[in-house]
Amino acid sequence: MSLFKKLSLLATGLVLTTSPVLAQSSSESSQSGSTQTSYESLEAASNELTPKLKEALDLKDAKKTLDNLAQLFKWEVTDSKESQLANSDFKYTIHRLGPEAVLLSTPDNKVLAFAMAKLDADTIRQRMAGLGVKPEAQMERLLNREPSPVDKVFVETKDFGLILSGHRIGQDEKKPDKPQYDLFVIYNHDFYKAMVKDFE
């Protein structure tokens, strides 16, 4: 199994174990009124959301970031769970924000990673642009191609470490031709290296 495939299992596993949206099947998700309402609110705010999202992320203060994101999305921090990488002393806390976001923080309150669920390819581009990340050509090709049942995309950037997008979780009824993705951004290179070391 390749390193990227192993990383995908860990990264998507973090989101899957902390996000009830991703834990549901696409049919269950489409039947959930609250999930659909939440997704529609994201879509409605998409034009102005990216600069606000960038402003909300304070990498040096996870608690402030959680408060900012909760206010921005009208979400609550519903769960916080401490964890540790299997073959490393790297400890972190997983915070669940509402139904569609996860934030990972260090014991000293720094932001490690941020994940959002149930996004389409265009929304991912907007989020990445808002975070100062330019999608690479490989990612553009993969985002533009015909979706497969499970479609994973990896982009490694100099400033952000690993960006994972592309765990397809179903189709939006309003955009049946567009796949749904996750956005998983690792901001801390030490954490990224520790993840890699876990699979060596």
Where are these regions (language model features)?
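Bacterial N-terminal signal peptides
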Residues: 10-18
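Short, low-complexity, Pro/Ser/Thr/Gly-rich segments in the mature regions of secreted, periplasmic
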Residues: 184-200
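Long, charged/polar, surface-exposed segments that mediate recognition or autoinhibition
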Residues: 96-155
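Bacterial N-terminal signal peptides that target proteins for export
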Residues: 1-8
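Cleaved targeting-peptide boundary
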Residues: 24-39
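Sec/Tat signal peptide C-region and signal peptidase I cleavage site
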Residues: 19-23
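Second-shell loop/turn segments in exported
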Residues: 50-59, 111-118
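N-terminal secretory signal peptides
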Residues: 55-94, 100-101
